[in-house]
Curated annotation (Swiss-Prot):
Signal peptide start-end: none
Subcellular location(s) per record: Bud tip; Bud neck; Cytoplasm, Cytoskeleton
Biased composition (Polar residues): 318-330, 366-395, 406-418
Protein name as it appears in the record: Protein SPH1
Any Pfam family: GIT_SHD
């Protein structure tokens, strides 16, 4: 058996009992009897068989019985009878005669020395606390409410986490030592009592902390709490000194209440100036979640600022080209900072011309007409020279995207190697425009909402996979046929309606991809928050997220909803989209806009208990998120329905065209 089986309470009891036994034996038992007991070969074998815990229980009972016999007091007899096991042991010890009882004390005294338990002095005990060798006061319920929560922690805190933990350890050690009987202070000893050493350490830690608190711009409440802390500490030192001087004359509640006042004052100060975490444990605890720094930077204002910048760029785009360009964000991540926002190009006509040039080069590979060679000089005068310097100085928003750029050696233009790649998904829809279309202004042949990123930038979805397989089957009808628009092999002219149908079809498919990808992000996030709200009402409340964490997670949904609302609204204003999306889609967008505003207001004031009760907050948050989930799914179905109608119309047009031929 080793001493680590004993708790700290038991170790302190053994040390105290050993000192009591030694002092009493030296005062009352003759030296010959003590020497005879030490030289005795036949020791008490029953004591050697006991474990450390059992031996501690016996030592405690013997010490209590010894105190009763020395004071001739039986006042504690009724208390010991409450525990059956301890009551039986006390009753047996009380029936022992003085000779046998003294012999038992000598045996216990010898057994303590044989087990080397008397070497566990308080200095070794304190060193073990710092090294974590002893589990100090693990079952203490007094400090359960003293655990650090999110309200006490802050990155701009003044009190370091190390000082907080050291003070907590000293507070616990002080309470621990007040639970045992304290003898009057012996002036002949060279070492201070452990209780006095503890209160001196507490005073030193608080004294080192006061200059740090004084460096802060003092508020009236903080000044009052500092005065309260100094007064409580002075009272605790005085109470400890009197408690050690007069022993049992002063109840232990006096010392405990005095140190409690110090703890209360320290907690009030910690709530005002906050505790700063510097350990690795607190940093890795929130890894993978939303940073508290970002949450402290008022994310709603950041989102509003980004929206204003985006709207300003859209207005400048309208002033240059006279049309509105629909630009889908290429990332499925929530837009929480400026660098994540997609850049809106001020002159969309340049990108449209580059796409026209790319489609012309693609058509040159399949066109067999000798007179149908394209002259890019007819397109170059249409470039906006006003914004050409801006294009060379500002990086393209697609330069950072993981796209494969295919160099075209046939292109006589120096921009041929830097043109953005049109993905395979859009190449299926890119057609070879006839001569009449090339000579027309670009604004008439290309829709202003054609500036949509390639499908490689958008998350893949099951619907997109089905559409691609469908297009591959349709393309088998003819080697040079496309869905809704046939690539001409002769001098025939195609109507502009066919070109518009193709462009419209490509954009409606990209809209489906965009809405589906965003729904895959919004729905799991909303469901996770709803699960935490439900857990907060059940027995799993401790495992649920706090109100502040729910607010932060809900704020992440807002920019994603706004991007879906913004892109879908811009698509609905186009003439070709009005018939497909209909009034039902418009109603869904209005409901989602209302949900986004309510969620923003709730998450701004939801963490403040004075604004809204916790129960009411959970109810409102659940209602909003359920509405968001419902409307998001309806929007996905609405866009899918519009896409199916478009595919059906294109397919019927394709077969009608084939039958005419």
């Amino acid at each position: 058996m080793i001493s680590s089986e004993l708790t700290n309470d038991q170790i302190i009891d053994l040390i105290s009992d050993y000192k009591n036994f030694k002092r009493i034996i030296e005062a009352s038992v003759p030296e010959d009897d003590r020497r005879r007991n030490q030289n005795r070969q036949n020791r008490n074998k029953d004591l050697t068989k006991l474990s450390n815990v059992q031996f501690w229980q016996l030592t405690t009972d013997v010490n209590d019985e010894l105190m009763k016999r020395l004071t001739d007091s039986g006042a504690d007899a009724s208390l010991n009878d409450l525990d059956l096991k301890r009551g039986k042991a006390q009753s047996k010890l009380s029936r022992l005669k003085d000779a046998k009882f003294h012999k038992l004390i000598l045996d216990i005294f010898t057994e303590i020395e044989r087990r080397n338990l008397h070497h566990l002095d308080m200095g070794t005990h304190n060193n073990g606390l710092d090294e974590g060798d002893l589990n100090f006061y693990l079952n203490d319920t007094l400090f359960e409410s003293f655990k650090i929560n999110d309200d006490f922690m802050s990155v701009n805190g003044i009190i370091s986490i190390e000082v907080f933990r050291e003070l907590k350890t000293q507070f616990t050690l002080y309470f621990q030592n007040t639970l045992h009987r304290i003898d009057p202070v012996d002036t002949t000893t060279t070492r201070l009592p452990i209780l006095l050493e503890t209160i001196i350490k507490i005073a030193k830690l608080i004294g080192d902390l006061l200059p740090v608190l004084s460096s802060v711009s003092l508020q009236s409440s903080l000044e009052n709490e500092i005065v309260y802390l100094k007064s409580a500490l002075s009272h605790a030192i005085t109470s400890t000194r009197y408690f050690l001087t007069y022993g049992d004359l002063i109840p232990r509640i006096v010392a405990q209440s005095s140190i409690s006042e110090v703890i209360f004052a320290f907690c009030n100060i910690a709530q005002i100036v906050k505790i700063k975490s510097t350990s690795r444990d607190d940093i890795s605890r929130n890894e993978g979640e939303l940073s508290d720094i970002e949450a402290g930077m008022k994310p709603l204002k950041i989102i509003e600022k980004v929206k204003n910048e985006k709207n300003g760029k859209d207005i400048s785009s309208l002033g240059d080209s006279g049309s509105t360009a629909v630009s889908f964000p290429s990332s499925g991540k929530p837009i929480t900072k400026k660098s994540d926002m997609p850049v809106v190009v001020a002159s969309p006509s340049i990108s449209i011309i580059e796409k026209s040039e790319s489609s012309i080069r693609e058509s040159g590979k399949v066109r067999n007409n000798t007179s149908g060679e394209t002259n890019l000089a007819s397109v170059s005068p249409l470039k906006n020279t006003k914004n050409s310097s801006r294009i060379t100085s500002e990086p393209s928003p697609r330069e950072g995207l993981p796209l494969k750029v295919v160099s075209n050696s046939r292109s006589p233009s120096p921009q041929g190697n830097t043109l953005p790649l049109i993905g395979k998904f859009r190449q299926d829809y890119q057609a070879s425009p006839p001569k009449k279309v090339i000579t027309k202004p670009v604004a008439e042949t290309a829709k202003p909402y054609a500036n949509i990123p390639p499908a490689a930038d958008v998350l893949y979805s099951p619907t997109v996979t089905k559409m691609r397989k469908f297009r591959e089957k349709v393309q088998k009808f003819a080697p040079n046929s496309g869905l809704g628009l046939r690539i001409s092999t002769s001098e025939e002219n195609l109507n502009n309606s066919d070109v518009n149908s193709t462009t419209h079809n490509a954009n409606i498919n990209n809209l489906v991809e965009f809405v589906e990808s965003k729904s895959m992000v919004v729905l799991p996030m909303a469901q996770g928050i709803l699960n935490d709200v439900q857990a907060s009402k059940s027995k799993l409340f401790k495992s649920a997220r706090s109100v502040s964490r729910l607010c932060q997670n809900s704020i992440e949904i807002i920019p994603i909803l706004e991007s879906v609302i913004d892109m879908t609204t811009k698509a609905m204003v186009q003439k070709s989209f009005k018939l497909d999306l209909g009034e039902h889609c418009k109603e869904i967008i209005e409901r989602l806009t209302d949900c986004s505003q309510k969620l923003s207001e709730l998450c701004t004031y939801g963490c403040d208990s004075t604004k809204l009760g916790k129960k009411r907050f959970y109810q409102k948050l659940a209602d909003i998120l359920m509405e968001v989930t419902k409307r998001t799914r309806e929007l996905v179905e609405c866009v899918k329905m519009a896409n199916r109608q478009t595919l059906s119309q294109d397919l019927s047009s394709f077969f009608n065209y084939r039958s005419v031929q």
